[in-house]
């Protein structure tokens, strides 16, 4: 059997075997050569910080092994027997190999091994195995000895989670340069690596760096940037560019050192913040402990004070009572005598009227249930007394007094019987006392000794219980005790010898008899049910009515309770009864068909989708835990609503422009018709002049000629207006801008910037109001309940609807004023777009909608549809007017596609546009002057260059990306353009200003968002040309 190992077997036991030097020294360590003790750190002696502990742990040498004992590892010599046995370990293979495995030994029953005599040892098998079931025996033909060590069994002490290591990762094979796919080659060229990029992350392991987070992603980006930088360095063999390479490397290293310093500073700031929080928490805990201690002390002192007050009050009351009692006998001496019954009844403060309790009971009161009710029997009149006396027998009214007789002398048997009766009476009195005080019985059910009535000459051997009749003076043996006749009880009182002897022998016979005693269980007598006296016959109907009313009230109360419970659980009841009302096929409820969502019309589905998306957006924003992100999302929600309103206003303006153009064309046609009618009238007058008189014909001819001249002039004016309206783009293109050194594209870009500056100025005011309303809404939603939140949401929707109606009305009024301008100026409101012809050929784009299933709202969702609508609104995109309100949705989709293409072109030419940014201010001023000189054609120029406006808008956003210098330069140019735009707008006509006012209100919020759909820093700088990234 395996013996327990001792601490120093590795040093002293020559047979102790280990696998190697590591296990040898590990056994010495496990022997307990060192003890751990706690040592103070005096520099941090009073510190409570976790990273500056006041004490530490150190090893204390407690080794008791002498110094001359060798601690080195001395491996045992290699034994050929062990080598042979290990070599033959794999001799058994195939399906029979598991039969020779040894299982781990379990501590079950004891194992008794009996050594067999040498002559009966079995022969050595030809193949041996270290894992064989039976160890190999010594001896044999080869003369091999027993190996030095044996493997009894192996079983791990560790669980799976403790033995778990890093997850296994498969190996990889680097492909040959010629075997790379096009994608792999493109990725390697893109990230400047000779091997797959994932191999650059070999140092990331699961405990450290994996799964990847924000820091790992930042690290990967830095590695990519560094490889790109190294690839962009001049070659090292270029001697002429070595200084440039050195300077670039130094700048890069300086940048890395600066980033590292910033990272270290941020880490230190975080540590300081954690320390500050820990100190604050500690101070709060100390304050709480001090407060609790003070409160406990206060409560203890208040309790002590209250106890002292109670003691003083009790002492005061006792002293006052003694003084009052002593004051009674100042003049009159106190008589110390027991009050008589008359005095006790005369004094209403005596114990007769107010008895004192002892042990919770009134000793002089009658026991419970033994009171005598005399209310219904005591006479109250003289006639009642007479009737009572006539009813009572005379022996109760006339007491009979007899002289006491001299007791007769008793003989021996009578005295013995009397002694037995006294003993029985004493036992009976004890039992009655126990019954009345200790509660050992109830009624007649109280314990009593059993008597054994068996025996010769004493009856049939049945058991009886001694009973007593209190107050009657009789005591019988009960049952058939002693086989006595029914008159045995009276004979006992008369002192008969047989009865006395039987009574005397009763207890003895009970003790001597060999029959076992049994327990007699009596039925428990319940107290009688109390009954109320019958009401008089006169009040019987009233009593019955009161009882009926009480029953009705109780029934109604029970019904109200049942009704309240049913109402409170009505939803659950309806849910449980849903199976009863639903038809078998699941298509009807109570006979009515179930209206499925897929059966609704397109308009209802669209409205439900919009309402659901809006509610989901608000719920997602309110569920956001970060206050800053919640404010950003709310601002983005307001911007998206403003974008939608701007798109609707643009569509309404397009409808108004279309109607104005239709009215102008109708007026021109009417004028042409009038001119034709006048010509016909002139011809008729000429014919009449030939047939009629000369004078009348001359007058008619003159009138007809005048009418024809007036109609011709009106038609000529109408035709000139139509021609001017059609030629407005040509006149705008024919402006002599080249003489000023300004190309048409630059003029359009300057016009867009002026308009954006004007609208950005109004957008700042609108956004300020939106932020104020959003802050108030957030406060209400953060502090209110669900009903208030729902009310606020309904108020927001109503406010947005009313605002949209006001903007539409203002835009309609402005366009109506602008449509009336041709009477003063022949220029129409806007030229007809050429895009209307190819509208049917465009493929409709899917309308993007905010996701209502996501938990968090992303502002990037507004990048495509809201940002494009706002860009078209700011640039005066005439394509929004195509098709009117009926085709506005398709046109918005086409504008979104055109805007995406323009944005891609703007990003491709960002570098070329950056060089032209310096002259933007001069170009804007020149454009303003040109627009002021040709105010009649300025609006047409802006409308004709709608695509250029959108491109300039996106180019302005692209130019804001390169760096802080470009942003500052763009901001300065935007401010100058805003001032010039304000001056130019001030010089324009009243009709144009009104139209721009309505358009600016419609697109006010659009100036606050950049191409990314997010809010810009500041108060609406995005509307001035600086797009938010």
From Swiss-Prot:
Highest taxon above the source species: Eukaryota
InterPro entries, A to Z: CFAP91, CFAP91_dom, IQ_motif_EF-hand-BS
Keywords of this entry: Cell projection, Cilium, Coiled coil, Cytoplasm, Cytoskeleton, Flagellum
The UniProt record lists the keyword Cytoplasm: yes
GO biological process terms held by the UniProt record: cilium movement
Biased composition (Gly residues): 1000-1015
Residue ranges, compositional bias (Low complexity): 837-854, 911-921, 933-944
Sequence ranges of Basic and acidic residues compositional bias: 984-999
UniProt entry tagged with the keyword Cytoplasm: yes
SMART domains in the cross-refs: IQ
Family of this protein: Belongs to the CFAP91 family.
Subunit structure: Identified in a spoke-associated complex containing CFAP61, CFAP91 and CFAP251; the complex is associated with the radial spokes of the axoneme. The complex associates with Calmodulin; the association is calcium sensitive. Interacts with RSP3.
The name this protein goes by in its record: Cilia- and flagella-associated protein 91
Species assigned in the record: Chlamydomonas reinhardtii
Gene name tied to this protein: CFAP91
């Amino acid at each position: 059997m395996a013996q327990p190992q001792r601490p120093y077997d590795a040093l002293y036991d020559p047979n102790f075997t280990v696998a190697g030097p590591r296990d040898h020294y590990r056994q010495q360590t496990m022997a307990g050569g060192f003890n751990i003790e706690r040592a103070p750190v005096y520099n941090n002696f009073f510190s409570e910080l976790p990273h500056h502990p006041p004490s530490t742990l150190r090893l204390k040498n407690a080794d008791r092994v002498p110094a001359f004992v060798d601690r080195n590892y001395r491996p045992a010599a290699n034994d050929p027997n062990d080598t042979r046995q290990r070599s033959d370990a794999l001799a058994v293979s195939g399906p029979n190999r598991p039969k020779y495995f040894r299982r781990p030994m379990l501590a079950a029953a004891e194992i008794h091994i009996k050594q067999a005599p040498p002559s009966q040892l079995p022969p050595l098998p030809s193949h041996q195995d270290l894992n064989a079931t039976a160890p190999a025996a010594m001896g044999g033909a080869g003369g091999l000895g027993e190996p030095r060590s044996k493997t009894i069994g192996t079983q791990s002490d560790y669980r799976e989670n403790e033995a778990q290591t890093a997850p296994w990762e498969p190996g990889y094979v680097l492909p040959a340069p010629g075997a790379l796919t096009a994608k792999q080659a493109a990725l390697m060229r893109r990230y400047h690596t000779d091997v797959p990029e994932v191999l650059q992350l070999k140092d990331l392991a699961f405990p450290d760096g994996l799964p990847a987070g924000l820091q790992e992603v930042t690290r990967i980006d830095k590695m990519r940037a560094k490889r790109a930088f190294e690839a962009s360095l001049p070659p090292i063999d270029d001697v002429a560019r070595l200084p440039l390479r050195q300077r670039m490397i130094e700048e890069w290293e300086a940048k890395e050192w600066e980033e590292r310093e910033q990272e270290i500073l941020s880490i230190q700031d975080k540590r300081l913040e954690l320390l500050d929080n820990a100190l604050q928490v500690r101070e709060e805990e100390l304050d709480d402990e001090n407060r609790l201690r003070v409160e406990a002390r206060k409560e203890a002192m208040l309790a002590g004070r209250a106890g002292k007050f109670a003691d003083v009050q009790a002492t005061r009351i006792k002293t006052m009572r003694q003084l009052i009692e002593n004051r009674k006998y100042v003049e009159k001496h106190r008589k110390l005598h027991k009050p008589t019954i008359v005095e006790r009844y005369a004094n209403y403060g005596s114990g007769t009227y107010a008895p004192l309790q002892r042990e919770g009971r009134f000793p002089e009161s009658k026991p419970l249930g033994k009171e005598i009710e005399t209310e219904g029997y005591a006479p109250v009149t003289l006639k009642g007394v007479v009737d009572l006396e006539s009813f009572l027998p005379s022996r109760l009214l006339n007491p009979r007094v007899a002289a006491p007789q001299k007791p007769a002398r008793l003989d021996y048997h009578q005295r013995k019987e009397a002694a037995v009766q006294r003993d029985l009476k004493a036992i009976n009195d004890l039992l009655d006392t126990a019954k009345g005080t200790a509660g050992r019985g109830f009624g007649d059910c109280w314990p009593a000794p059993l008597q054994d009535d068996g025996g010769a000459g004493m009856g049939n051997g049945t058991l009886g219980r001694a009973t007593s009749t209190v107050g009657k003076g009789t005591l019988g043996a009960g049952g058939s005790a002693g086989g006595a006749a029914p008159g045995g009880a009276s004979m006992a009182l008369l002192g008969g010898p047989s009865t006395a002897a039987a009574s005397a022998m009763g207890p003895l016979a009970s003790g001597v008899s060999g029959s076992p005693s049994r327990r007699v269980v009596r039925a428990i007598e319940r107290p009688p049910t109390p009954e109320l006296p019958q009401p008089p016959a006169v009040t019987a109907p009233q009593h019955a009515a009161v009882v009926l009313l009480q029953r009705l009230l109780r029934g109604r109360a029970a019904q109200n309770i049942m009704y309240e419970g049913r109402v409170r659980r009505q939803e659950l009841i309806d849910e449980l009864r849903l199976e009863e009302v639903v038809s078998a096929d699941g298509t009807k409820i109570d006979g009515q068909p179930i209206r499925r969502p897929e059966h609704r019309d397109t308009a209802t589905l669209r409205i439900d989708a919009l309402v659901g998306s809006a509610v989901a957006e608000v719920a997602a924003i309110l569920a956001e835990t970060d206050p800053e992100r919640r404010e950003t999302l709310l601002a983005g929600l307001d911007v998206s609503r403003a974008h939608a309103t701007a798109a609707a206003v643009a569509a309404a303006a397009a409808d108004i422009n279309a109607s104005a153009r239709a009215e102008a064309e109708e007026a021109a046609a009417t004028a042409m018709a009038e001119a034709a009618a006048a010509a016909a009238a002139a011809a008729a007058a000429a014919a009449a002049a030939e047939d009629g008189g000369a004078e009348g014909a001359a007058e008619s001819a003159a009138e007809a000629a005048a009418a024809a001249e007036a109609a011709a002039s009106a038609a000529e004016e109408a035709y000139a207006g139509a021609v001017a309206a059609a030629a407005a783009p040509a006149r705008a293109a024919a402006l002599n801008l080249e003489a000023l050194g300004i190309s048409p594209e630059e003029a359009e870009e300057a016009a867009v910037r002026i308009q954006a500056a004007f609208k950005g100025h109004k957008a700042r005011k609108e956004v300020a109001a939106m932020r104020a309303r959003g802050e108030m809404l957030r406060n209400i939603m953060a502090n209110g309940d669900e009903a208030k939140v729902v009310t606020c949401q309904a108020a927001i929707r109503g406010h947005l609807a009313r605002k949209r109606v006001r903007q539409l009305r203002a835009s309609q009024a402005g366009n109506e004023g602008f449509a009336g301008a041709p009477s003063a100026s022949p220029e129409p409101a806007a030229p007809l777009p050429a895009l209307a012809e190819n509208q049917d050929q465009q493929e409709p784009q899917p309308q993007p909608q905010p996701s209502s299933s996501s938990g968090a709202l992303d502002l990037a969702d507004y990048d495509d549809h809201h940002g494009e609508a706002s860009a078209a609104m700011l640039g005066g995109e005439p394509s929004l007017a195509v098709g009117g309100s009926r085709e506005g949705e398709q046109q918005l989709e086409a504008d979104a596609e055109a805007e995406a293409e323009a944005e891609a072109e703007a990003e491709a030419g960002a570098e070329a546009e950056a060089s032209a940014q310096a002259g933007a201010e001069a170009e804007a001023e020149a454009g303003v002057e040109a627009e002021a000189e040709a105010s009649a054609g300025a609006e047409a120029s802006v409308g004709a260059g709608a695509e250029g406006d959108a491109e300039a808008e996106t180019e302005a956003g692209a130019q804001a990306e390169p760096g802080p210098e470009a942003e500052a330069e763009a901001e300065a140019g935007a401010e100058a353009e805003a001032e010039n735009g304000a001056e130019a707008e001030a010089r324009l006509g009243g009709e144009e200003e009104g139209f721009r006012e309505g358009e600016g209100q419609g697109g006010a919020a659009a100036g606050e968002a950049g191409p990314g759909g997010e809010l810009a820093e500041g108060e609406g700088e995005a509307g001035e040309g600086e797009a938010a990234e």
